[in-house]
Amino acid sequence: MNVMVSFNQLRNYFLESNSLRPSKWLFQSYGTSSSANILNGKLLARKLQRSVAEEVQALKAKDRNFKPALAIVQVGKREDSNVYVRMKEKAARLVGIDFKYCPFPETIQMPALLHELKKLNDDHTVHGVLVQLPLPKHLNERTVTESITPPKDVDGFGAFNIGLLAKNDATPIHYPCTPKGIMELLKDNKISVAGLNAVVLGRSDIVGNPISYLLRKDNATVTVCHSKTKDLIQHISNADLVIAALGKPEFVRGEWLKPGSVVVDVGINAVQRNGKRVLVGDVHFESASKVASSITPVPGGVGPMTVAMLMENIVNAAKIARTENIYRKIDLNPLELKKPVPSDIEIANSQEPKLISNLAKEMGIYDTELENYGNYKAKVNLAVYERLKHRKDGNYVVVSGITPTPFGEGKSTVVAGLVQAMGHLGKLGIACVRQPSQGPTFGVKGGAAGGGYAQFIPMDDFNLHMTGDIHAVTAANNLLVAALETRMFHENTQSDAALIKRLIPVKNGRRVIPRGLIGRWNRICASHNMDPEDVNNASPELLKEFVRLNVDPDTIECNRVLDVNDRFLRSIEVGKASTEKGHVRKTSFDISVASECMSILALSCDLNDMHSRLSRMVIANDKYGNAITAGDLGVSGALTVLLKDAIKPNLMQTLEGTPAFVHAGPFANISIGASSIIADKIALKLAGTESFDRPEDAGYVVTEAGFASDMGMEKFFNIKCRYSKLVPNTVVLVTTVKALKLHGGGPKLKPGAPIPEEYLVENLDLVKNGCSNMVKHIQNCHKFNIPVVVAINSYKTDSSKEHEIIREAALQAGAVDAVPSDHWAQGGKGAIELAKSVMTACDQSSNSKFRLLYDSETSIEDKVNVIAKEMYGANGVEFSSLAKERINTFIKQGFGNLPICMAKTQYSLSHNPEFRNVPKNFTVPIRDMRLNAGAGFIYPLAAEIQTIPGLPTAPAYLNIDICENGEIVGLS
C-alpha cells in the first residue's frame, strides 16, 4: 500500500467539515439496509481530542512551561501536501499544541535536509517531528524519516518504535497512529480481539505490519495476507476480524466474509462513478455491512482516529520530555571498601566512572547541552541556565574551615563525601569545586581531588589538563601582556602619522575604526562632543589621542603567567634582543591561577559579562595618571574568544557517581579562592524545583571556599555573592582533632620529621584549648547571618571524648550541629549523619536575613578595617604611605566602590603566620594596594605573597609516572 494512505486517512476526519470538503469529491452512502454496527471513528475521535485538549489545559495550568509542540517538515509545494499540513496544523491548535511549519525548497539536498532535521531533534521546545510525504525523488524517504529521534517520532514509523512494537516484552515510545486508532476504536465498542482469528490484508509498515503486532500482543491469532498470498478468499472467509489496508477500491466483497465478523476498512480510494469522483474504502461497504456484525465507514471510520492518536502521541512526547526534565535521580556507583584504606590513586583507578553522558542525563542535562571530552568529562553549555532559569534554586551550601594547618583539614574531601551522602539519602547533590593548578600538583601539595573514598574522578584528569581551561587563561593573559609590550614598542618607534595610518586605516576613502577599539573611540569622541561617525573629519590632535596610550611602564599591573611552579621566573628582564631596540623592562611571571583573567572567569555571570570584565581590566596607567584598560588596547574581544570555551563549566563525578562541576581556580591568596559563579548558577537550577514541586524536592549544591572563614568564606560572601546575587543556606565548617591540637598549643610540625605523639594519642586539653579557633570561625559565619554545621573530619587516631569536646564547644558557640564524618574511609555512607544535619540546617535557614559586612559605598579604608576587625579580631589597620597613595589613585579613577579581597597569610587569623589559635591585640599592616578592576575588586597586601611558587627539594613529580597501559601512578 502506498505511504500516502496515512495522510489520506488523516484527511478523512476533516472531510466531515463542509468548510474543508473538496467539492469535486462525492461520498458513498452507507445504505439503509445495513445490519452491521457502525464503528463511528468520528465521534470517538472528537471525544478523544476533547480529552487531549483538557489534559493539555490542565498540565499548562499546573506547569506554565508545558508547551507541547509539533514540527512538520515539507519539501516542495505539492498542493495535496499543503492540504494535509494545514489539516494537521488545525488539529494541533485545536487541542493546544504549538505548531512549527518548516518548509524547504524542492531543490534541497540530502545533507542539508538531514541537518535541518537534526536541529529539530536537538530543539527541546519541539516534541514531535513529522516529514510530509512524498518527498522529491532525489531524497531517500526511509533515510529521512529514520533520522527523526525516537522520542519525537510521533508517527511511530521509525525502526526504533516499530522494532519495540514487534517484540513481545517491549513497549514503543509511540505507537503508529492508524493501528493505535484501530485498537482504540475496537476497545471503545467493547470488541475484544483475544482468541479471534484476525486477517490483515496488506503488509505496509504504516498499517499492515504494525496492526498485526498490536493484535498479536492482544492475543489474537493473526494472519497477514498480501499480493502473493494463495487462497486469499479462504483466509478472509475464516476470519473473525478483517483489517483491510491494501489500497484496492472495494476489493473485499460481503460474500467473502464470515457472518458476524468485524470489518475495519483502512482504505481510502478515489473512483469515478457516474462521471464523478467518489471516495470509497478497500471493502465493498454495501455488501459487507449485511454480513459483518460491526464495520467502519469510509470516511468517518479509521481516518479521524488517526488524527486523534497523532495528537495523543504529541502530548505524550511532551509529557515524557517534561518528566525527563523535571525528575532527576542519580544512580550511585557502589564502592568496594577496603581496610586499610588504599592510596588515593589506587582507589581512583579501581573505580569505573559512569559515562559522563549518562550522568548528565540523570541530572536533566540534554545531549545537545553537553560537549564531551572523552567518556568521563564534558563541558556544559550555558544554555542550560537559560532553559531552567524559571526554576526556584536548590539549596546552596558552602564549605569552609578553621585556620589551616600543615595536616590539611580536608574541605574538598568533605564536599565529595557530602554530595555522595546526599545520593544515599535519595537527594540530588551537586559539588562545585575549583580546578587545581598543575603547579602544586607537581610541587609540594600534590593533587586536590579529595581523598580516600571521597574523591573526584578521573583523578588524573581532575588534577592535570582537564579540558584545557587553565591553558586558555594562560594564553589569554599572555596575549594581553604581549599586546601591551608591543604597543609600547610601536608607540616608541613610530610617528603619529604612522600609528594613525596603521590603527585607523583608510578603506574606500573612509577611515575605519577596528572593532576592538570602537569603545575607546566612542569614549574619546564623547569627551570632545564629537560625532563618532565623523571619523574623516577628526582633528589630528584627536586622532593622536586615540592612537597613543602613553603607557607609564612603572605602573604596569599585569605579568605573564605559567601553570608551573618556577621560582626563577619571579624576577626577569624582557626585551633584551637587539630587535627590541632597547625596550628593556624588569618584570616577572605569576602562576596562571593568579591571573586576573582567572578571577574574571570565576566571577563572570555569562559570556557578555566576561567580555565586559575583560575589557575593564586596568593593565597600567598612562603618564597622566589615567587608567589604561584592555579595552583601550583593543584586545578584549580576542581574549574573550580565547576563553569562549573555558567559560563553560566542566562536568565530572565523585567516586560514587554523583555530579561535580569543576570550574575556574582563582588563587585563594590574592583572589577569591572559589569556583565559578556560572557553575553555581547552573547547578542550583539543575537542583532546583518547579512551581508545582514540594520544597523537599529541592536538591543541594555544595561548593567550597578556599582556606578558612577569615579568607575564602569572607571573600565568597563579600565578593562572589555580591556579584552572583546568590545566598547560601548553610555553612559547613570543617575541623579536625589534629588541627585543633596544633592551635591549642601542640608542638610545631617539622618538615621530614615524624608527627609528634601528641597528635596520635588522646589529649583533651590540647583539643579544648584549640576549640577557641573553631569558635572564632563559627562567629565569623554568624556575622553574615548564615547557620553553621561543624563537620569533624574523623581519623582513626581520634577519640570519642575529643569529638564530644568539639561538639559541645561548637553548640555553645551557636552551631546548628557538630557531626563526626568518616567519608574518607566509608565514602558517602560515612557522611550520612553530616548530610542529615546539613539538610536540617537548610530547612531551618532563612537566607533572606543574609547580610554583607559592608556596603559598596563604604570607603576603601573602612572596608579594610571592618574585615580586619570583624573577621580577624584585629585592633585595626595601618596603611603604608604607598597604600594610601594607591587608594587615592583608585578613587580618582572611579574604583572606590569595589569590594575588598584581602591578601594575607592563610596560616593565622592575623597577618603573621606565627600567631596561632585566636591572636589578640594586633594591627594589620597594609603595605600596598592592587587593583583588579575587571574582576571587580581591590586587594590590599597584608603580607608578601608569592604569586608563583617554587618547587621543593623533593617535589611530588618524583613519584608520578605512567604505565605501559596508560595508567598514571603516583598522583595524590
Curated annotation (Swiss-Prot):
Record bears the keyword Ligase: yes
Annotated Pfam families: FTHFS, THF_DHG_CYH, THF_DHG_CYH_C
Formyltetrahydrofolate synthetase as annotated region, ranges: 341-972
Assigned keywords, A-Z: ATP-binding, Hydrolase, Ligase, Mitochondrion, Multifunctional enzyme, NADP, Nucleotide-binding, One-carbon metabolism, Oxidoreductase, Transit peptide
Molecular functions per Gene Ontology: ATP binding; formate-tetrahydrofolate ligase activity; methenyltetrahydrofolate cyclohydrolase activity; methylenetetrahydrofolate dehydrogenase (NADP+) activity
Gene Ontology biological process terms from the UniProt entry: 10-formyltetrahydrofolate biosynthetic process; folic acid biosynthetic process; tetrahydrofolate interconversion
Record-listed ATP binding positions: T405, P406, F407, G408, E409, G410, K411, S412
Catalysed reactions, semicolon-separated: (6R)-5,10-methylene-5,6,7,8-tetrahydrofolate + NADP(+) = (6R)-5,10-methenyltetrahydrofolate + NADPH; (6R)-5,10-methenyltetrahydrofolate + H2O = (6R)-10-formyltetrahydrofolate + H(+); (6S)-5,6,7,8-tetrahydrofolate + formate + ATP = (6R)-10-formyltetrahydrofolate + ADP + phosphate
The keyword Amino-acid biosynthesis is annotated on this UniProt entry: no
Location of this chain's protein in the cell: Mitochondrion
UniProt-annotated stretches for the region Methylenetetrahydrofolate dehydrogenase and cyclohydrolase: 56-340
Binding site for substrate: Y84, V85, R86, M87, K88, V131, Q132, L133, P299, G300, G301, V302, G303
Binding site for NADP(+): G202, R203, S204, S227
InterPro entries: Aminoacid_DH-like_N_sf, Formate_THF_ligase, Formate_THF_ligase_CS, NAD(P)-bd_dom_sf, P-loop_NTPase, THF_DH/CycHdrlase, THF_DH/CycHdrlase_cat_dom, THF_DH/CycHdrlase_CS
Annotated domain remarks: This trifunctional enzyme consists of two major domains: an N-terminal part containing the methylene-THF dehydrogenase and cyclohydrolase activities and a larger C-terminal part containing formyl-THF synthetase activity.
The protein's assembly and partners: Homodimer.
Family the entry assigns: In the N-terminal section; belongs to the tetrahydrofolate dehydrogenase/cyclohydrolase family. In the C-terminal section; belongs to the formate--tetrahydrofolate ligase family.
Name the record gives this protein: C-1-tetrahydrofolate synthase, mitochondrial
Native organism: Schizosaccharomyces pombe (strain 972 / ATCC 24843) (Fission yeast)
Lineage, broadest ranks: Eukaryota, Fungi, Dikarya, Ascomycota, Taphrinomycotina
Recorded name of the encoding gene: ade9
